[in-house]
Amino acid sequence: MEIDILSLFPDYFASPLQATILGRAIKQGALSVRSRDIREFGLGKWKQVDDSPYNGEGMLLMAEPVVQAIRSIRRKKSKVIYLSPQGQLLSAKKSRELASCSHLVLLCGHYEGIDERALTAEVDEEISIGDYVLTNGCAAALVLVDALARFIPGILGNQESAEYDSLENGLLEGPQYTRPRVFEGESVPEVLLCGDHQKIADWRKQVSLERTRERRPDLYLQYFYGNSACLSTQEDLPRIEVVSPKTFSVVLEVQDLRKAKKFYSRMFGKECWDGDKLFLLGKTSLYLQQTKETRGPTTVFIELETDHDFVRFLKRWEMLGGELGEQGTGGFPLRQVFDLDGHIWVVSCVQK
């Protein structure tokens, strides 16, 4: 695999790419990483690469030097990635996907960013390593290289280690132990010493689930959602309890009252209806009002009692034709979903 990194600081990558597993992989020829200086494509005598933006403060990388730098190394099957906090969050799944590419061009951001026209013209995908801002994109490029390199055959001494690491299967890895058997009075779990591979595998899976549920409930719910059985009938869908300590009513404008009522009947149960009024729980009510033209989407906030209800809600919503939106960040079970008329439901789960 070949990777070209475009930045203003090509020397930044020298030491990390010469040491550790990455350095060994490069020496063995399993991976090729080259660092290029965008300034080589700067304009004029002084090789200018940045200028002040029209609509803000600071400096931006200019479109022309960036575009020329990319085109100088881009090939027919190259994939150009811009490291940006606005991009898709890097994951083990994405790293594995990128490891199958033959040639990557990593574009590092500097200053306040890059002229949008360069991104539109040349960038295939934007990737973020987290919801924070760095002084430049060089560190993010190194993170991406390291993350995807682990999935390139021959780079890790034991390829199986990549398969069992945290997040590879959507869960956090469980605790690890080595010799001695007892340290400061604390023993290695007996199951790891029994020699029964199936029991050990079952134990690892269980502690992995427990650790993920405790430390990263967002990942736990995402895993649970992705691996739960597909629900196909109304009988399979038990009543979802909605937490509502206060009285409130919501009016939703819909273009097809019959269709909308059928959707919400299957979501919350036919027994909850009184005419065109839906009782979600106790004093909470939802009114449907048919209109030819809606005044725009309404946002409804709903909190569910358990994480199982949260997952069932999302499964049912998608099965009935609703759309799933963005997943919340920060470890909190939160998801935006859209009904058949485009109204927004912000769904969360009680934190216990």
From Swiss-Prot:
Catalytic activity, EC: 2.1.1.228
Gene3D superfamilies linked: 2,3-Dihydroxybiphenyl 1,2-Dioxygenase, domain 1, 3.40.1280.10, tRNA(m1g37)methyltransferase, domain 2
Main localization of the protein described in the UniProt heading: cytoplasm
CDD domains assigned: TrmD-like, VOC
Cross-referenced InterPro entries: Alpha/beta_knot_MTases, Glyas_Bleomycin-R_OHBP_Dase, tRNA_m1G_MeTrfase_C_sf, tRNA_m1G_MeTrfase_TrmD, tRNA_m1G_MTases_N, tRNA_MeTrfase_TRMD/TRM10
Any Gene Ontology CC annotation: cytosol
Subcellular location(s) of the protein: Cytoplasm
Record carries keyword Transferase: yes
Reaction(s) the record says it catalyses: guanosine(37) in tRNA + S-adenosyl-L-methionine = N(1)-methylguanosine(37) in tRNA + S-adenosyl-L-homocysteine + H(+)
Role noted for this protein: Specifically methylates guanosine-37 in various tRNAs.
Protein name: tRNA (guanine-N(1)-)-methyltransferase
Biological source species: Chlamydia trachomatis serovar L2 (strain ATCC VR-902B / DSM 19102 / 434/Bu)
